[in-house]
Amino acid sequence: MRITYTFIFLLAITLFSFPLKAEESIRLIPQPAELQMQSGTLILPGSVDISYSSALKKEAILLSKYLQESKLTTKLYSGKSDAMIQLQISPTVLPAYKEGYVLQISDRNIQIKSSSSTGIFYGIQTLRQLIGKYPDQQLPQLFITDYPNFSWRAFMLDEARYFKGKEVVCRLLDQMAYLKMNTFHWHLTDDQGWRIEIKKFPKLTEIGSYRDSSEINHFESDVFDGKPHSGYYTQKEIKEIIEYARERHINIVPEIEMPGHASAAIASYPWLGTNNESIKVPGKFGVHYNVYNVADSKVLDALKDILTEVIELFPSPIIHIGGDEVKYNQWKESPVVQAYMQKHALQTPAELQVHFTNGISNWLSSKGKRMMGWNEITGSKLHEYQSSTDTAIQNEKLPKNAIVHCWKGDYSLIKEAIENGYDIVNAYHEYTYLDYDYKTIPLEKAYHFNPVPEGLTVGQRIHVLGVSCQMWGEFIPTVESMDKLLFPRIAAYAETGWSLEKNKNFQQFSETLKTH
């Protein structure tokens, strides 16, 4: 259903602000790289002409829609030189920053220039925020030069635990775009649900998308609500969502969990599992023992067939394969898996996982895709239920083109991955997990998160692609409960991803939220 607060966060940032005098400094979210206030104002007319370069028609249409939401009428023109708002592609504008832009409000017009359509789009988001700050349509004259601090500015939504639906996802994409976040990480499969249609394996959604009950209250409560839960996206719906995101310059990175967090898939096709036994899609949350039989070529082929359909759907250059929280018990107890390990000189279960991951990574590379996974894919010991013996690595090393999504373990492991030459995205759970309550991660803690570990050289810093914040869904059954945890903290992560460190100021940021 369409909830009444579909754009509540956008409104909180814009429409209910108090006008500032033109000569005063302006605080935006995220804060631009450079903002120069100039004397004078520009009064927007009731009807606004928008001129655009030929490659910017979709951006111009979106700008027109945004302005109409602010009760302005608009007319679109291709190449009109005297339009009130002018969108222009210019190869000489911030050529080193393809997401960068310049925005100038003069006494005559508003110009947004960039070397890319993405930069133009982000300039439009800044203009939206400025217009929202001045409901009397008297905009201060200014000049903004803006570009992101990090190339990866991500929000992850877990729908494997609770399905939210297309309308909610599109609303979240709108809010991400407004905050200049460019990556939607979509967690579509896990133990408790499979949410993506795979035509070659229809039971993945016929069986895997349904569970008969859900654990409530907290992990290990063993209290269940007794309510069936189901839902999945057809490939048609996914294509529509991808297009919606593309128009907002957001890349969607799908996550298909392997070799663990596989219970829903194994419930659908028991032969995928190491034990080849029938199970139900679990309603209990937490880490489960069922894992794919990575020693079976039929299972490996099935996983590649699944990924083939995923690749055909998602234009993303990056595919996330999960790889987290794999319990090794079934592999250690399986004669078939043990024989496979002996044949391939794999000494430990962690080596087996890295061996499997390398095979998937190489296969994805052959399809023009780059693999990403949670930092267990390096083979490091992250969990108390793992032994040092099981996680010892001798003969297998993760390929250097893999992206390591760092979420847990000793914080030094992030620096270690970078020193070993891997690109990383910092998603350290103590700072970025949106399902944690505000006592655990208050707004200020979220805001001050720095994804760059201390002690890196200049050359090593380039391996930090950026930051992601995660909305895990185990105990987030409703959109309302999700939104309470998501807003306003997502704005803090957005500013961390976009704004230069020198421009960040929590007091100003929090005051901006209060007065908007």
Where are these regions (language model features)?
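Feature activates predominantly on carbohydrate-active enzymes
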Residues: 94-318, 334, 359, 468-473
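Bacterial Sec-dependent N-terminal signal peptides
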Residues: 1-25
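Flexible loop/turn segments at secondary-structure boundaries
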Residues: 58-59, 163-165, 191-197, 259-265, ...
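Flexible, acidic glycine-rich loops studded with aromatic residues
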Residues: 371-378, 383-516
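Active-site neighborhood of glycoside hydrolase catalytic domains
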Residues: 265-270, 280-402, 407-416
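Contiguous, structured surface segment used for ligand recognition
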Residues: 23-150, 481, 497-516
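Conserved, mostly hydrophobic/aromatic
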Residues: 50, 116, 155, 176, ...
